């Protein structure tokens, strides 16, 4: 009977660890585009990173999922241009090029909603740091 108790305690500890790890490191959630329908651009509006604290980090983290626990993919500074493709609970799913470029293939209508796979980068940032500037 003692072995069963040890096994049960070990198993419950392992399950608790796995649950904690799952909460601490959520899986990636691809940014989707085409949510505006087949007649409108894949992502709107064209936006800019603003409102960062110049005395602080002065960047916004781009994350793999719409949560602060999501893996950091990149850091964007003030003035960086991005496309907002999706919004989820205070997070903006964005697409952005290497510079203030277009050519990310989100500026035209697409026939159906799909996960963004390139050619530019994508991820999630806090919506409070993204300000629409066009579209």
Question: Where are the regions that the model predicts?
Answer:
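Boundary regions of SH3-family modules and the immediately adjacent low-complexity/disordered segments
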Residues: 25-46, 96-135
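SH3/SH3-like beta-barrel fold
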Residues: 79, 92-96
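SH3/SH3-like (including bacterial SH3b) beta-barrel domains
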Residues: 64-78, 86
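Positively charged n-region of N-terminal signal peptides that target proteins for export
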Residues: 1-4
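Short, basic/aromatic beta-hairpin or loop at an interaction surface
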Residues: 49-62
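Bacterial N-terminal signal peptides
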Residues: 8-18
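Sec/Tat signal peptide C-region and signal peptidase I cleavage site
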Residues: 20-24
């Amino acid at each position: 009977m003692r072995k069963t108790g040890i096994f049960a305690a070990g198993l419950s500890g392992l399950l608790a660890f796995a649950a904690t790890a799952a909460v601490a490191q959520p899986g990636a959630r691809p940014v989707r585009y085409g949510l505006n329908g087949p007649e409108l651009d894949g992502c709107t509006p064209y936006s800019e990173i603003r409102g960062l604290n110049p005395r602080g980090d002065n960047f916004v983290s781009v994350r793999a999922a719409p949560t602060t626990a999501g893996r950091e993919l990149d850091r964007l500074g003030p003035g960086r241009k991005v496309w907002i493709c999706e919004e989820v609970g205070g997070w903006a799913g964005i697409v952005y090029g290497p510079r203030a470029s277009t050519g990310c293939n989100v500026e035209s209508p697409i026939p159906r909603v799909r996960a963004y796979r390139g050619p530019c980068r994508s991820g999630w940032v806090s919506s409070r740091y993204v300000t629409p500037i066009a579209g």
